[in-house]
Every structure is written in structure tokens, then in C-alpha cells.
Design a protein with these regions (language model features):
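Non-catalytic terminal extensions that flank enzyme cores
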Residues: 1-13, 317, 326-330, 337
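A short, charged helix-loop
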Residues: 192-220
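Accessory alpha-helical DNA-binding modules that contact the DNA backbone or grooves
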Residues: 208, 216-290, 312-313, 318-331
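Noncatalytic, basic helical substrate-engagement surface that gates or grips nucleic-acid strands
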Residues: 2-10, 14, 18-165, 174-192, ...
Length: 338
């Protein structure tokens, strides 16, 4: 079919001709929902009417701060699509089943109506946020049945192959993607992770992070690992993981089968957990249909939207945000670099 032919032609082209557009010299790729939830959880800001606007304001301020910090040539924000967890829940039904929003610092906010009020506020704010973002010179992506992680991975490793990419997220899943062209900025820690910093903090280089994490599991997504084996224990058993070469899950299991230690025997016994977690946690080869990949390519390669200042000002006045962003015109100037 023509769509598949177009996709394979594109794949061949990107392998031999990585992107050279000046626009794509340094792309800031934002994990949208991760950034929003962090802002919603910790930012207690209220507008003039006393409504909680922490998610909206916190997100906008965070994006502006990060653009000012890195001076990217463009910005792409990716949100989880509808039914985004569905494919992974087919593999493991408990995936993200217990994920909840934690309003750690929202002491000024009256959630007396219980979780329902909080969820309603969150939905209203994220919907409004998209209206703001559509007025900024930013590319926004959200695709049904896909998590932002998978789309971000495809953008950074394929669509923008050859470009410098800064991923903005507090999600450790992205450690595995870091290389000479891709870095990870954690807005919670205000730290930018390159290969060496991940080696220093996590104990292994990025290419072996996935091997460690599929054994350790991921509590934030409700993915259990092999009980009793953490990263430090695994690295002690297999020191090769600390070296600057790829040691994947398949090699781990082959090596474990050759040893008679308790740790290796536990790994062999729980092989199914390791293989399942690999499917759930790997981002290098995201499960995206060819037609959907073309949608991502078209969105990233399209012209960057123009700044629509008058529409932004209208939203700003309607939402009564002058107490949170006092000098709106000055605040907007940072987006002019995009």
C-alpha cells in the first residue's frame, strides 16, 4: 500500500540523510502529562476567583524556564493519547493500575469534595492548557493508543536522528535513550543527564539501564521486578553491566544460565518477569504502526505554528492570571526565540 511504501522510503532516507534543518539543530521534546502532573501536584496557585490554576500556570512557567535555560531551536510537546496504556495493559493488566495524582503542596486548595473535585479540576486545567499551547510557536502531539514515552522515543531516535534533543521529563524510563545526541532534563531536580551523569548516579551507562530496570521493576508504573534483586545486587553479580558496552536482557539470561549462584538462579527462575518487563519498559523500538509513524513525521516536519498573541491575552484575561504572571508581555518574549 502507498502509505507503507511512503514510510519505508522515509526510513531509508533518514538512515542515509539525517535531518539537517537548522530548525532542528536543538529540539526540546517535552513529556506533557508528566510535566503537567508535577505542576498540578505541587503548585498551589489560585487565580483571582480562588480557583486552583497550579497545573496550568506551573506548566507554562516551567516550559518558559526550560526554553530560557536551553535556548532550543524549536519545542515539541507530546501528551499521552486516548487509551494510551491499553497495549501494555494487554501484556500486564496491572500496568499503571494504581497511579494516582498526589497533591503534596496544595494546602491552599479546598479539595473538600474529595478526589472527584481534584480530577475535575485537573481535566479542566489540562484542556485549557492545550488552548494556551496552541497559541504558542510549539508543536503539540497526542496520538490515540500511544503513550508519550513511545512517541518521544520515535521522535528523538528516528524522526530527528542527527539532531540534538533535550527530553524534559522526571521519568527515569528515558535514561535508556540518552546518548551523545540525546540528553534528559529533570525539571524536579533541575539536572541535565548525559551519559556520564547517568553512569555516576545509576551505576551503569544508558545502554544498560533497561537491563537493570527490567529486573528491578518500576514502582511508579506498578511493574514488579524480580523480588530480592535490586540494581546494586545485579551489578555486583554481573560487573559487565558497568562497562561502556551493551549487555542486554538476552545476554543477561544466557550468562545467568551458566552460573550457579543464588542470584543467577533467581533470574533464570523468573525469566518470564524479565521478558515481560522488557516488553513493558523498552523504548528503543516502540510499538507504533507505520501509518502512525508517518503522522509523527508529518507533524514534526511541518512548519512551526506562529505566536498568536491576541488569543493568548484573551485567555489570560478570562482566566484572571495576572496575579500569577504579573508582566505577561515580558513573559511572552522568551518564546520569540522559537
Amino acid at each position: 500500500n502507498l502509505l507503507n511504501k511512503r514510510f519505508y522510503d522515509y526510513e531509508d532516507d533518514i538512515k542515509t540523510n539525517p535531518t539537517t534543518r537548522k530548525l532542528d539543530d536543538h529540539v526540546l521534546v517535552v513529556d506533557g502529562f508528566n510535566t503537567f502532573i508535577r505542576a498540578f501536584s505541587v503548585n498551589p496557585s489560585l487565580n483571582e476567583d480562588g480557583s486552583h490554576v497550579g497545573g496550568l500556570v506551573g506548566f507554562l512557567k516551567s516550559i518558559r524556564y526550560t526554553i530560557n535555560k536551553f535556548k532550543p531551536t524549536r519545542c515539541v510537546i507530546v501528551f499521552d493519547g486516548k487509551n494510551s496504556s491499553k497495549s501494555r495493559q494487554k501484556v500486564f493488566p496491572e500496568y499503571k493500575a494504581g497511579c494516582k495524582v498526589r497533591s503534596r503542596l496544595n494546602r491552599n486548595v479546598d479539595w473538600s469534595g474529595g478526589p472527584h473535585d481534584e480530577v475535575v479540576s485537573m481535566k479542566l486545567q489540562i484542556s485549557r492548557l492545550v488552548e494556551y499551547l496552541e497559541c504558542l510557536p510549539i508543536t503539540i502531539l497526542s496520538l490515540d493508543n500511544l503513550e508519550a514515552d513511545d512517541v518521544i522515543s520515535y521522535i528523538c531516535t528516528s524522526t530527528l536522528k542527527g539532531s540534538k534533543c533535550t527530553i524534559m521529563s522526571s521519568d527515569k524510563d528515558f535514561y535508556q535513550l540518552v546518548n551523545d545526541k540525546i540528553q534528559l532534563y529533570s525539571p524536579t531536580k533541575k539536572i541535565t543527564y548525559d551519559r556520564d551523569l547517568i553512569r555516576k548516579e545509576f551505576g551503569v551507562y544508558p545502554q544498560n539501564v533497561l537491563t537493570c530496570r527490567i529486573v528491578d521493576g518500576d514502582k511508579s508504573d506498578g511493574i514488579p521486578g524480580v523480588r530480592g534483586i535490586g540494581v546494586k545486587t545485579l551489578v555486583k553479580e554481573f560487573p559487565i553491566l558497568t562497562e561502556d558496552e551493551h549487555f542486554d536482557a538476552k545476554e543477561l539470561l544466557v550468562s545467568a544460565n551458566k552460573k550457579t549462584t543464588r542470584i543467577s538462579e533467581m533470574l533464570v527462575k523468573n525469566e518470564y518477569i524479565i521478558k515481560r518487563n522488557y516488553i513493558l519498559m523498552q523504548l528503543h523500538d516502540p510499538d507504533i504502526k507505520n501509518q502512525t509513524k508517518l503522522k509523527i513525521v508529518d507533524a514534526v516536519n511541518s512548519l512551526v505554528p506562529k505566536l498568536v498573541k491576541y488569543q493568548l491575552q484573551t485567555l489570560f484575561v478570562k482566566d484572571k492570571l495576572w496575579g500569577q504572571i504579573p508582566n505577561f508581555d515580558n513573559w511572552l518574549t522568551e518564546f520569540n526565540i522559537l
